[in-house]
Amino acid sequence: MHRIKLSDLRGIDKQIDRVEQNTKQFIDGKPANNVLLTGARGTGKSSIVKGLLNKYARQGLRLIEVEKNDLVDLPMIVDQVAGRPERFLLFCDDLTFHGAEEGYIALKVALDGSISTTSENLLIYATSNRRHLMPEYMAENLETRYVGDEIHPGETVEEKISLSERFGLWVSFYPFDQDEYLDIVAQWLKHFGAAASDASREEALQWSLQRGSRSGRVAYQFARDWAGKHAKKK
């Protein structure tokens, strides 16, 4: 069981609410969407999914983590879970494709609702640092056509967008500012039994500069380090 609690996550309340509401609908047997969570690294995308499992496991929620290369086995996975009473989230973490890979094609087919790759008790939740799951290149902009005042993306861009558009719910995440970062640090320090102080805040900012990021993950790692160094000996 994942130990992450939704209540531990800071600065992403709106994102939590959207994903949790969709998940509750799914657990209750109501219509719900496949979900794509995109944005900056370390901002809580995968933590939300794991926190949902922690919160709703007793209500029948289950998580199946799948690497992108294993997405070709989707029909077999669906066959294994179809008819079971639990509600399954097929979870693809940090998903990025670099072309028409087998996993890309399999996922596209599943999101299209192919009978062999869908079940009423299974949804696909994916996280990615790329909004459209694939790298974007400057040269692709040269394919753009202009018809009057309208802009028409080229075929390459259209193909890349086509996969992400198949997810019914998009949830975006953004980098934290300094105050949000320090709030997350304070939350994790409390979690580890330490109190925030002027010294810890100063060290936390130095830590983030060294890491080149003020993400939730960096805040968590700092809090573990600080709490460990300043914990009273037992």
Regions found by a protein language model. Give the residues of each.
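Dynamic helix-loop-helix/coil hinge segments at AAA+ ATPase domain boundaries and subdomain interfaces
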Residues: 1-17
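AAA+/P-loop NTPase substrate/partner-engagement loops
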Residues: 6-9, 55-88, 95-100
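Pre-Walker A adenine-sensing motif
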Residues: 13-28
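Walker A/P-loop nucleotide-binding motif
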Residues: 29-51
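Conserved AAA+ ATPase "SRH/arginine-finger" region at the nucleotide-binding site
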Residues: 64, 128, 137-138, 145-161, ...
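Conserved catalytic/switch belt of AAA+ P-loop NTPases
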Residues: 83, 99-149
